[in-house]
A protein has these predicted regions:
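Predominantly the C-terminal beta-signal and adjacent terminal strand-loop region
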Residues: 75-78, 147-191
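Extracellular loop and loop/strand-boundary signature of outer-membrane beta-barrel proteins
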Residues: 41-44, 79-86, 133-139, 170-175
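Cleavable N-terminal export/targeting peptides
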Residues: 1-29
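Short glycine/proline- and aromatic-enriched beta-strand/turn motifs that initiate or cap beta-hairpins
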Residues: 21-70, 187-191
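Gram-negative (and chloroplast) outer-membrane scaffold detector with strong preference
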Residues: 57-131, 190-191
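Residues that define the transmembrane beta-barrel architecture of outer-membrane proteins
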Residues: 28-30, 48-54, 87-93, 109, ...
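Short coil turns and loop connectors of transmembrane beta-barrels in diderm outer membranes
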Residues: 3, 24, 28-30, 64-66, ...
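Membrane-embedded beta-strands of outer-membrane beta-barrel proteins
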Residues: 54-56, 93-97, 113, 149-151, ...
Length: 191
């Protein structure tokens, strides 16, 4: 009897110690992600220079758990002027490469560093250059280009859905409004 109990305990131990983990970050896998967040600081009321962004991207995984990313983003920011706020909007396309540099043993959490090229269009005050007080807005609508450096954390909720948290610094050298924008966002990725 003791022999049977010992064999069953050994079998149960083998079942729990050699668990198979989900297949994640394999070459050729594809994912679609949606993110939203705040830019240039955290402002919770409408009376400040509140800024937000939303974006969508498509990822293709390569060797060593790295990935190519292509996507688009919309950034909206308000600038104070006298007793009004002037909206600035940026529409950008992104193409970049993300390098995974840290993950846990169970492949639940992944930390990646990404470098992207950005290009798009920037508009000030919805292209209205004459302000209500008679002033003329000198900032012109223009094409913008630059890059972004991103630190991204992926936490897998299921085998096909991951929660994203990222921080990124965008540098847009041809912008009339601001060259640098810091963004913090949350999102979901569907594999």
């Amino acid at each position: 009897m003791k022999k049977h109990i010992f064999i069953m305990m050994l079998f149960a131990l083998c079942l729990t110690s050699f668990q198979a983990h989900a297949q994640r970050y394999l070459p050729g896998m594809k994912g679609l992600q949606v993110t939203a967040g705040m830019a240039d600081g955290v402002h919770w009321n409408d009376n400040t220079d509140f800024a937000y962004h939303i974006g969508a991207a498509y990822s293709v995984y390569t060797k060593n758990a790295n990935r190519w990313v292509i996507g688009g983003e919309y950034l909206h920011k308000k600038y104070d002027y006298k007793d009004m706020q002037i909206p600035v909007e940026q529409f950008t396309a992104e193409g970049g490469y993300y390098l995974k540099f840290l993950s846990d043993r169970r492949k639940t959490f992944f930390l990646s560093l990404g470098l992207s090229a950005l290009a798009g269009y920037e508009t000030s005050n919805q292209s209205e250059k004459l302000l209500p007080d008679g002033s003329t807005l000198l900032d012109k609508d223009c094409f913008i280009y630059g890059g972004a450096l991103t630190l991204e954390l992926e936490a897998y909720l299921t085998d096909r859905i991951a929660l994203l948290a990222n921080a990124r610094e965008r540098a847009l050298f041809s912008s009339d409004i601001g060259k640098f924008h810091t963004q913090v966002s949350l999102g979901l990725k569907f594999i």
